[in-house]
Amino acid sequence: MFSLKRFILEQLIKWKESKYRKPLILKGARQIGKTYILKQFGEKNYEGVAYFNFDHDEDLYNLFSNTKDPSRILEQLSFIYGKAIIPGKTLIIFDEIQECPNALNSLKYFQEEASEYHIACAGSLLGIRLSHTSFPVGKVDFLNMYPMTFTEFLIADNCENLVEYMKSIEKVATIPDIFFNQLEEKLKAYFIIGGMPEAVKLWTEEKNIELVNNIQENI
């Protein structure tokens, strides 16, 4: 079974535990797994995850057009979520937040008036830049997410033994052929497959480069 381990989870935990925590914006290119990682983080570290996607819900978009009051917004979000949103116990996820400038701007009011609520947002780099007119400067935390690293690729491909070996060797050391050949093979695969999670998942399951190429063309 494919298991996606991203080291950015450690940074998300630090954000959760910080007493200076502000609403978080997780930035990065499309298709690198921002939504997946935020949901995974929420499921592992909170009692509930209230997920809202601005790309698919016009009513949600209109909600933020009608009020800037965090208490009113939370009341309506709880209704949509179907249960109470509890400070510190429910992670609120705003996905594709760049699609709703009013929601992006509302983060300022959440930081000032309702900072006890944990809010994490996912957005594309370009979309957030284009929303600069309503950007809550100084009122949010940022975290940049990138495609999977070689180490993350190895873990996804069930090669934890190679990861542990790489940790154990000195910066300048002769690598025995038994490890060197495996590392070289995996590194070549990583250069071809890349670090997009969907492509990596398909590669670990099928080991078929043609299928992977089809995925890459559609990313």
Model-derived regions: residue spans:
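N-terminal pre-Walker A segment at the start of P-loop NTPase domains
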Residues: M1-E17
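Hydrophobic anchor at the beta1->P-loop junction of P-loop NTPases
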Residues: L26
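Hydrophobic positions on the alpha1 helix immediately C-terminal to the Walker A/P-loop
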Residues: I37, F41
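Short regulatory helix/loop adjacent to the ATP-binding pocket of P-loop NTPases
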Residues: Y109, G127-L143, L154-C159
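Interdomain hinge/linker elements that couple catalytic modules in large macromolecular machines
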Residues: F150, I155, E160-I219
